[in-house]
Amino acid sequence: MINIEIHPDSDFPIQNLPYGVFSTISNPSLRVGARLGDWVVDLAILDNENLFGRRYGFFRDSSLNRFMAAGRDVWREIRQRLIRLVGEEQASLKKEALIPVHEVQMHLPVEIGDYTDFYASREHATNVGIMFRGRENALMPNWLHLPVGYHGRASSVVISGTDVIRPRGQVKPKDAPPEFTASRQLDFELEMGFFVGKGNDLGEPISIETAHDHIFGMVLLNDWSARDIQAWEYQPLGPFLAKNFATSISPWVVT
């Protein structure tokens, strides 16, 4: 009989159960799993055994995209069933469905089609504004009225632990011409990233009242920034090379 023990201080109790994409040495195929304590639950095996009540098929995918697109009713149904399976119905689980976390290799959880970074913290916007424009002009007038953001580079989103190469670009020394060099002011920003699951038709806005039904889950996000490159290039259209070289996210998506 399987007995899953979870340390009281674990970040991954039964109340969490985040989703991710993983592989193992014995089975290099990418598939979907859920984190429970020091274990990864192989959802593809559970699905193959019809333990969710019906077979979904998307847990054998190399990304969460089809699962995310299924919508909130399916998300809720699977989560409720998974909680029962790893809780009161542990006896129905196969041993092969539980893999020690140190034996898995994590992968990017989602095929990311687009990525928008919002400038949502007043304190952060003020501090960066002071860095570039001085204290008197730190906060731009539009910040108080609209969600300031920029489109990042989806192809350079990587999971935590991936090496980040220091970017090179133009910087403008004081009282000297711009020069092409490696960034000397590489910065990091701890943020939260939201994955949108169910989409919308082109040109049709999502209302505030229904936005919750479209948000699949959250990850920790590090918006790497080359501040010296950014200071020279950001006017008039905002950051470009200063922020498109890497964005790190956690491999587990908390829902």
Residue ranges of model-derived segments:
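Active-site microenvironments in enzyme catalytic cores
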Residues: 1-24, 35, 44-255
